Amino acid sequence: MENASQDKREKNASYQPEMHVRNANSREIFKNNRLTSQFLRNYTDIPLLANVMPEDIEDVSEKYQAFLGVEFESDTIKKVYIRKADGTIEREVYVLSLIEHKSDIDYDVAMQLLRYMCVIWQEYKATQNKIQEGSSRRKNFRYPLIIPIVYYEGKRKWTADLNLKDRIEFSEEMEKYIPDFTYQVVSVRQYTNEELSEKHDEMSLVMLINKIQTEEDLSEFRKVSEEMVDSTYGNAPDEIKEIYKKILWSLLMKLKVPNEEASNIIGEIGGH
């Protein structure tokens, strides 16, 4: 990629960085159901989500912001419908994935996720009781499964406790009285550039870009197989191409890369 031809860059001369959001964050990525489905299928290792497709996902983030406030605006909440092996919908199972976007370690993330869960379950209860009065008081009433996931872009190893109970005093002595769950961390750095390149899906290129935090990272990114980057970018829908450009531009600006050089780097993946 370092020797990308001038012709490729000229083809992409119409790209104007100032037209794009410079502070793109991960929510832009996970608002896209195609990228989200690839992430859930290929990077979480959760059997229940192994066959999730874009059409099985509904973004319900805005529904809960009225309850949770502006501090949660960067997070996404998805409702996922589970299908049978033959592709038919078995039923509308409410599997809500909470994907946090942390560039550094948040040691209180388990408690933050619990707040999400309580709001989601409370809203679900209210909705079901409107449909059928008193339904939540019945023995067979069940609340929806919530799968909490942290998408971590930072360089440091994630060292926060993965269980809610570990944030509460007397967690061992009084364990049976303490609510608990485990959240999953998917770190972009748990994969090498080679491993991501081999996955060859659109989310893998997102994660390759998200790994760029230093000039050394940028240099390593530009060594990634040009064939992989070109084919992944070239076959991506236009809305995903725009996401690539936005997140890459945002990262290059954080590295204080000059505008002209940043445009050329984007041209290396965007010259189609």
Protein language model regions, located:
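Elongated, amphipathic alpha-helical interaction scaffolds
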Residues: 1-272
